[in-house]
Amino acid sequence: MNIPQKLAAEFQLRQEQIDNTIALLDDGKTIPFIARYRKERTGSLDDQVLRAIDNRLQYLRKLEQRKEEICTAIEAQGKLTPELEEKIRGAETLVETEDLYLPYRPKRKTRASMAIARGLEPLARILMAQNPRTNPAQEAEAFLQEEVPDTEAALQGAMDVLAEEMANDADLRKQMRRLVMSAGTIQSRATEEDADTPYQNYYDYAEPVKRIVGHRILAIDRGEREGALKVAVTLPEGHGASLLIQKFVKNQSPCGKLVQTAAEDAFQRLLFPAVERETRKALTEQAATAAIGVFASNLRQLLMAAPLKNRIVLGVDPGYRTGCKLAVVDETGKVLDTGVAHITVSKGASLEREKDVIRKMLRKHHVTAVAIGNGTASRESEAVVAELLKELPYSAAYMVVSEAGASVYSASKLAAEEFPEYDVSLRSAVSIARRLQDPLAELVKIDPQAIGVGQYQHDMPKAELSAALDGVVEDCVNHVGVDLNTASFSLLSHIAGINQTIAKNIVTYRTENGAFTDRKQRKKVAKLGPKAFEQCAGFLRVSGAKNPLDNTAVHPESYGAAEQILQECGFQLADIAGQDRSEIGAIAKQHGISAIAKKAGVGEPTVRDILKELEKPGRDPRDELPPPLLRSGDIMELKDLKPGMELVGTVRNVIDFGCFVDVGVHEDGLVHISQICDRFIKHPLEAVKVGEVVKVWVLDVDLKRKRIALTMKPPKKG
């Protein structure tokens, strides 16, 4: 198999793009670096496409390695024919490859292997010949011995040999898989008819294999694991065995009838159970891959949410018995004040005293935004905060933010190192405040799996889920870039080319020597060698550096080109120090991007990227996104919602069958996929994303079950 050619065909890319991408990956270049600084070589492939190519490349290389191992193993048995080798070399998947190896694989003890050990394989050959003149019972008499006491035992042993050979036929297994995928049905039923479980929808359920969607597969799998469901894959009567009969039965002679019996046994006992297991495994893997993709997409949107800059924020971690933990952070995230207020259980004069704790913090620090965790006691805390904000002589607002993972972080070693002087509960309040200020900087400290924007994430294969989510975090951190002098250890460790050891060394160097003054100074950091420097240089900014390019995403290797571009447009480096120059792009277009690229000695994609940085040094791509939705008015409760009511909310989670929207009543409403838009969409992610502010209308409210049905389709007038 020519892997580069296969990748080019699969991804519908030029061969040159694939060849260059493979060369860069094999040279140890990171995906963020390739996506940003090697666009000319890859044809401007983005990080998501590059990751897909890398994953597929690893699979195909693993496939080729396995083919080599199998050919070597069969050759050692003296059974590798040119035809078999050609089939193995041409196999497209690991499953297909293993099918071809199955007849030659060292076997455990089976009915067929025991029959062969008793010398019954020659009898199996006689039966398979299906000679109309052959008398099976007479032929069997020649094989009787101590372990084969009669002709019935001899014929049964011979049929066992045939059944296993039929079930191991690679072409037949492929046909059977196709049949199950096209005509099979997945069925589930309750293990206890009247049991009250979350899986009641699947107590008497059947759906064609080819139509069942991922989230239903995962639900059925979980129900089976928890003992609530029994699950099976079925075929229409007679469909499966007929494949074997058509292939192996030549006539209805006495031998032919025994071969047919062996074929039916092969189907029922060996082939179909194996294909059923494989089919369910394949469905689960497909569903898991899709669910991981949704989780990754949701995480990407959450991490790339617009930060709330230049605001002093109060973080509130709600609670009942232990009170609400409070933390005020300044514009940079530095903790200014902490406290506890028992506002959810106090009454009368006692409640007013507790409110005063928050009042004083709000006024003392001129807090303009409050972040309230959405966990226990959030509702009561929100009511008090909304009331107190109205008393302020200046404008302030609040937002209920997800607490997911905050408790995990606050009890972690990382949090203890960052805030040794605070107890666990106060660290959580700090984290909640910072999540509103800069979601990316705060959420990278938390295991992505704890952030809670997926579906069935606890059922996903851990390694695949972790790799996908870590890739998203890496892409997001590098896309935004970090300030070398203020970035936390967590942020630094996700920068291309920087591992945890180098990240710690950067923080240590900063502590011992003061702030970095330019990018070159980074070379003094222990373990940060030339290769790592090449990978990370463009993603680490130095604000206030003597060379203003050090505060941009322009890679040091392109500084000469950047200065040439400035010169062509009539500017000098000093002209972009600390100020935006939006006119540079327009001037460059007048000169012609192609002409400038030739003079600067770089490609057009690099010129365009450099121009963006020169127009706005230190730019944050998240600033171009809509700001988070803050609330300041009266809060609503579930009972206040009525069908037809128009609301504005924030998408909190996107799943296969819809999205959940926070409309400010503490129960997220579900917009079913059919209610997202008028056009047909296969998946909600085609139309909405996590963090997006959307307009919705109430369809129905179930107060008893605390469920809200919403639509994003405007009501028809008249």
Where are the regions a protein language model picked out?
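Accessory alpha-helical DNA-binding modules that contact the DNA backbone or grooves
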Residues: 30-31, 46-145, 149, 337, ...
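Long, charge-rich intrinsically disordered scaffolds of nucleic-acid metabolism proteins
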Residues: 96, 399, 405, 410-480, ...
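Low-complexity, acidic/Ser/Thr- and charged residue-rich accessory regions of DNA metabolism proteins
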Residues: 139-151, 205-206, 241-267, 271, ...
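A glycine-rich phosphate-binding loop feature that marks nucleotide/adenosyl-phosphate handling sites
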Residues: 178-185, 316-320, 375-380, 401-408, ...
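Long, charged amphipathic helices and adjacent flexible linkers at domain junctions
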Residues: 278-296, 450-481, 598-639
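Short beta-alpha connecting loops at secondary-structure transitions
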Residues: 341-346, 369, 411-424, 453-457, ...
